Amino acid sequence: MHSKRGRARLDASFAMVVAGFSLLCCVSLACFFPHSMMFDGASAPLYRSFNSGFGLASFVGALAYGVAVFRFPKLFFAGALAGYAMLGAGCALLMAVVGDAWVAVTAGALCGGGLACAYVYWLGLLTFMHRRRAMTAQGGQALVGGLAFSLLSLLPLEVARIAIVAGAAVSCVCACVAWWRMRASGEASIAGLQEKGGVFS
């Protein structure tokens, strides 16, 4: 049985996971519908260029991250940080796209690869939770993330851009805090977390 203080810490950790995952969901939707970050009047070829890079890199990124963590579990957190760094760079580059298709492809590849790693990280955290909490977190991130993205359409483009980048940054902070809480609880290895049921149960 958890003490009241321990239960409060678990609830706070769970809320942080939902918040971080939800923000990442919002950013991912912004990448799926890049009009929220591209300049007004961007051409259809630019959108196709971005989507081409995004789709291929998403597949490669998720596969590479999964294989790497399977072979070297310590890369679980480092890979997530690398993913967030790629995502940030991709968003910044996408916002700077003026008319160069190759820049759009590069931005798409960075966003796709970065999102893949970050998403797999959060999905990995769900496996450390009690089943009911994991299902709630999975549904909650889609609901809250989708709602947040819909609200972006009410904002001017420049404000929406800032909100998207800020959301990615806060999501990264949540990812770092979640990992720190795991290590502080003595659950330093992926194998140990899986065997003991995790720290968010």
Residue ranges and their predicted role:
Residues A101-Y119:
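Hydrophobic core of transmembrane alpha-helices in multi-pass small-molecule transporters
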Residues R131-P156:
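Glycine-rich segments within core transmembrane alpha-helices of 12-TM secondary carriers
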Residues V177-S201:
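Flexible interhelical linker loops that connect adjacent transmembrane helices
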Residues L115-H130:
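Intracellular juxtamembrane helix-capping segments at the cytosolic ends
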Residues S49-R71:
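Central cavity-lining transmembrane alpha-helices of secondary-active solute carriers
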Residues I162-A184:
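Symmetry-related core transmembrane helices of the 12-TM Major Facilitator Superfamily/SLC fold
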Residues S3-N51, G198-S201:
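Pair of pore-lining "gating" transmembrane helices in MFS-fold secondary transporters
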Residues Y84-G99:
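C-terminal ends and interior cores of transmembrane alpha-helices
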